[in-house]
A protein has these predicted regions:
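Juxtamembrane "helix-exit" motif on the non-cytosolic side of transmembrane helices
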Residues: 21-36, 65-66, 91-106, 130-132
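Active-site-proximal alpha/beta segments of enzymes that process anionic O-linked groups
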Residues: 53-125, 178-179, 190-372, 489, ...
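Internal/C-terminal transmembrane anchor helices
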Residues: 136-159
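Histidine-centered active-site microenvironments of extracellular/periplasmic hydrolases
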Residues: 167-171, 428, 432-471, 522-524
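Beta-strand elements within well-structured catalytic alpha/beta cores of enzymes
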Residues: 174-195, 208-209, 233, 296, ...
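Substrate-binding rim/cap in mid-to-C-terminal beta-strand-loop elements of soluble/periplasmic
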Residues: 215, 446, 450-499, 514-516
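Active-site His/acidic residue clusters
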Residues: 314-321, 361-414, 418
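Polar, surface-exposed loop/tail segments
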Residues: 438-443, 484-488, 496-527
Length: 528
């Protein structure tokens, strides 16, 4: 195997690894990026790129050379162009996807990186042409490869990632609310469930939500990150401010002193972008912005939070509902029907049954709180989302799935009835899902046609609209308004509780859900 081939392949791999380091640094502006860590990371990512990209390229070049031998073949310019072109596209995609997850300066530098890699493509073309024309010797070719490796190094050293810490908001009092609050996080709820699946008279409580509640679709921020969306709902801020992005973090102590909160998007997952298996997956850092329930608790309102997704640290309001099946009040005929309906799906039976038991335990805990002195109850239910994800009937012949979903809808309707029946008069009830679920798109279907893809029936990966429903005094029954955003939920609840809206909240009050008389009698108040 020729030395030139080794230089071309491994040099290109090192360039790809260094570009990956730049992208990881850009995605985590809140992490202290000391020069020592950056410099330590350079050889790590360069060698990782040689292994993960350079070695496959070397094998490919060797095979190509065997079938198409040529003495003067020099592949470095074409390979470098390919790396920088992919980097430009990938950086641009991440800049578009994570616009709301990064601070303004960090996002701006990420956009500039996309342009910089485009310029690097032109540099590779020009430099390669000059070497071929005026000095096509081994020394000049090695110098070209060194220059390509140096481009991402120069980029990260001359244009460091702007440091930006997340917004810090402690649980300060907001005042005394005018009424009690029950907010039900119903994961997987969307207009399809409410208007089509729940159209039957068999679901009286879902019918009540549809006919007596005011509703707005919720357009989730992209990309789909479950914890980020639920945290935005509770805090009224976007992930770039509250700091919760993924449901996991990564520690790479050799390079970073803090936990990485976000990895860049790549077509088939980005876990392998961290070098040499030196990283450790850990729970993400907690939200830096206090959720609305914490501010109500600081105002003296007794609070109960059951199962709300996110990273909340040691929040004393959080309760863990016991999922002991013996203590779960699941009516025996419903239990038997669900067990029979799950029999044809052994691969997901245990997972879905655990979710059913867990949700029922959460309902029991929430009902106990509602019947007591607790004035602020938050509960999250996950069974509907899990059942729809793997067993949504999407073809006429999916009769077993259809029967199973009907039972899940019956169970959900009973749980809603139990929760609504435990609320006192004048209680403000909110039902929210910050995202919906949709069947696989054309790309996923194409992957499945060729034997790839996944086995889910519906997914939130495409960021379909969720739903926000309100019940109570001051709500215009049956009203439908334009789509809201996840951060709009918290300020809307503040306003309807007679509390001031915090100025730091990115969302706004969804006034279309409120009656004109309530708007006239309750002027909007804003506090820091």
């Amino acid at each position: 195997m020729k030395l030139r081939m080794w230089v071309d392949a491994l040099g290109t791999g090192a360039t790809a690894g260094l570009v990956a380091e730049v992208l990881v640094l850009r995605m985590n502006p809140e992490v202290t990026q000391a020069m020592r860590g950056v410099l330590v990371g350079l050889p790590l990512w360069a060698s990782w790129g040689m292994l993960m990209a350079g070695v496959p390229l070397l094998i490919g070049l060797a095979i190509f050379e065997r079938f198409r031998p040529r003495e003067d073949r020099w592949s470095a310019p074409a390979l470098s162009m390919m790396v920088f072109l992919i980097a430009a596209v990938l950086t641009g995609v991440n800049a578009k996807l994570y616009a709301l997850l990064l601070s303004g300066p960090a996002h701006r530098v990420l956009v500039q990186d996309s342009v910089a890699w485009g310029v690097a493509v032109l540099v590779a073309v020009a430099a390669g042409s000059l070497v071929r024309r005026f000095g096509n010797s081994r020394g000049w070719q090695v110098a070209f490869s060194i220059m390509m490796v140096a481009l991402p190094v120069v980029r990260i050293l001359t244009v460091p990632t702007p440091q930006r810490q997340h917004l810090e908001v402690t649980a300060q009092p907001l005042g005394e609310p005018e009424r009690r609050l029950l907010i039900i996080g119903l994961e997987g709820l969307d207009t399809k469930v409410l208007l089509v699946d729940a159209a039957s008279a068999s679901y009286p409580n879902l019918t009540r939500l549809r006919e007596q509640g005011a509703r707005a679709p919720i357009t989730p921020h992209r990309p789909y990150l479950r914890w980020a969306l639920w945290t935005s709902t509770a805090t009224g801020t976007y992930p770039g401010r509250h700091g919760v992005k993924d449901h996991r973090g990564w520690d790479l102590p050799l390079v970073f002193s803090e936990t990485l909160r976000l990895l860049p998007w790549t077509p088939e997952g980005s876990r392998m972008i961290l070098p040499w298996g030196l990283s450790k997956q850990v729970p993400p850092p907690p939200a830096t912005v206090a959720p609305l329930w914490a501010r109500l608790d600081a105002s003296g309102v007794s609070t109960c939070v059951v199962g709300w997704p996110g990273s909340w640290g040691d929040d004393p309001s959080l309760q863990t509902a016991s999922s002991d099946e013996v203590g779960t009040a699941l009516e025996w005929t419903m239990r038997a029907s669900l067990e029979a309906a799950l029999e044809p799906f052994p691969e997901r039976r245990s997972q879905i049954w655990s979710a059913i038991v867990q949700d029922q335990a959460r309902v029991e805990a929430a009902v106990d709180a509602l019947k007591g002195p607790v004035g602020n109850v938050w509960i999250n239910l996950e069974t509907l989302s899990l059942a729809r994800r793997y067993h949504e009937p999407i073809r006429p012949r999916d009769t077993r799935e259809r029967r199973f979903l009907e039972l899940i809808m019956e169970l959900l309707d009973e749980q809603l009835g139990t929760l609504l029946g435990a609320t006192a008069d004048q209680t403000l009830v909110a039902v929210v899902s910050p995202f919906g679920l949709t069947p696989p798109g054309s790309f996923e279907r194409l992957k499945r046609f060729f034997g790839g893809g996944e086995s889910w029936h519906t997914s939130a990966e495409g960021s379909p609209d969720g739903l926000f429903i309100l019940l109570g005094n001051g709500i215009d029954p049956g009203r439908r308004v334009q789509p809201a955003r996840p951060p709009d939920v918290a300020p809307t609840l503040c306003y309807l509780l007679g509390l001031p809206v915090a100025q730091y909240m990115d969302g706004s009050v969804v006034v279309g859900l409120v009656t004109p008389s309530f708007l006239e009698e309750h002027p909007l108040r804003v506090v820091d």
